Amino acid sequence: MTSELVGFLQRNGHLIGRFAPIPCGFLRKARAVLVVVAPGQGAQSPGFLTPWLDVPGVAERLEWLSLVSGVDLIEHGTRSDADTIRDTAVAQPLIVGAGLVTLLSLFPHPSGAYASISAGAGHSVGEITAAVGAGVMTAEQAMVFVRERGRAMAHAAAVTKTGMSAVLGGDPDEVVAAAREVGLTPANMNGSGQIVVAGTIEQLASFVAPDGARVRALEVAGAFHTEHMAPATTILGKIGNAITTHDPRIRLISNKDGQVVHDGREVIRRLVQQVSQPVRWDLCMQTMLDLGVTAMIEIPPAGTLTGLAKRAMPGVETLALKTPDDLPAAWKLIEKHGVHSVIDSTPTWRLVIAPAKGTF
């Protein structure tokens, strides 16, 4: 029998109880752990919502969210061209709205989601979708917030001509050092050998990728998740203060540092701050691994995050929910990996107060 460390509690010199650490082996047995993730800007493509309109209730929900946001989600999700949906003020509400309606198709009853999902996360604007899924704020609050986020970031991007480039491969430390040498910000640390750098057009032009790395310019409106977005942070801070929140009902993993956030107000604060701070998706994936995640479902417009996970999280079963045809496979994955409260939220010690039977 293995020995056990036991601590004793005293009050006024009298022994009142003891506590014993629970061996980690009892808490971390092999089990199924499901995470649902929401993609960010750039994942959208023309017509990606078209097949979803055949799902009962989706069109009506999209119409409602369109009214709330002032953006025609059905038009932009089914008929608008690539240039139109690349516009930040269009893309952001479209991505969040699409994620919200497809989440309801995946989990028609929210209680079913909370009983199945162990953790949630979103990349950049996808964090807003994840916050709604976790119960932090309502869909309507999210659509107003993301509408103003898109507008504010578009206005901030218009001040100075800026952009972003993806750096693929190479040593991450060398890529970051080379970027900072010319004044660029490593705006997205995506893991799996992908770093997105951002800054002025002149800075991007002067960037020289280290050996083994290649650079691909991104078609975005500006240097998101950098100091160039500071004006947007100021605007969103005022809006965020007006949002009534609830604490997350699942583990919500933050882009800022990969930490699990348990306080609803803190979630909103981080959503405000993240527009001018780097996205640390690499740390989010590391947290998922630390939590023992065994499966990941990515909601529409899906594909980007599961692609990163396949390289950075080997052994984790992934599913990109692209069309309604993927729903049966997603439900099967939920049945296999969805277990209520399986991620450890209990402390690694237990307090026992005498006289409890068997204490002494």
Each language-model region and where it sits:
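Alpha/beta catalytic cores of group-transfer enzymes, especially the acyltransferase/condensing modules
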Residues: 41-43, 69, 81, 133-276
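FabD-like malonyl-/acyl-CoA
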Residues: 26-174, 218, 295-325, 356
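Ala/Thr-enriched low-complexity intrinsically disordered regions
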Residues: 2, 20, 30, 346-348, ...
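Extreme N-terminal basic, low-complexity initiation segments
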Residues: 1-10
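Acyltransferase
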Residues: 214-299, 303-307, 318, 326-328, ...
